Amino acid sequence: MNYDKARILQDVRTVIDQNQTESGIGGVATDADTLELDDIISKNITTAARHILLNCQLRMVSNDGVKDLPKTQKIEASIEGETANPGGVVVPPIATEINITADSLNKAVMTLPDDYLRLVIAEMEGWDCPVRVPTEDTGVARMVCGSRFRGVRPNNHRPCVIEGQQDGKPALFLYGADEGKGITQAQYLPVPKFDIEDKINLPEMLYDAIIYQTAAMTLQTLGSQLWATLAQMAERLSGIEEIRELQQRAKQKGV
């Protein structure tokens, strides 16, 4: 959903005013000139939005805040199975900046647009299920995905997606790709930014979290001790707090 900068400024100021009044903390923000306060808020909006979008629960991301990657491209490369020698380059059937290549490791490489921030979902034809959370790009992951043995590396029953770099550009490595198969669905969260009309596209369910995170960063800049409370509220509204609690429990159990 598109939001005007003027509305965001107003909503952030409202959150700051309400919370300073309820907490009984002195008006650090109200002591600042209105224009100065708006300037500080403006500088923090996209940074706050980026933080929330990178760390939020994906179930809170709706279609109004995501972008589609092309779904009609086909993998037209020779998949040789057990050998590890790369082969084949794809010629996309449509004009696009997204290029796909495939090699003999049943891997498709999709170079990504400059505004790519976070994967929402990726799925290729023949996969039993889509991938929503990329595997961390580690040496172990690369070793498994790059194994010359077909039974070890990912396949269409257990696909894997790794975010990495290809020729200095961000790319998705989709393991479990088959010859002649294309992308059935692929969506990503773009880097949040304002357009020439001072509008910004944000997921509606995350709007309040972004407002609170912006307010928190603004108060931190102004030296108010209230910023931590608002930051905690932002994490609660976006599901980040829940994610951290689950991670902590898993760590305690040694998972």
Pin down the residues of each PLM region:
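Glycine-enriched, solvent-exposed interface loops adjoining structured elements
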Residues: 1-255
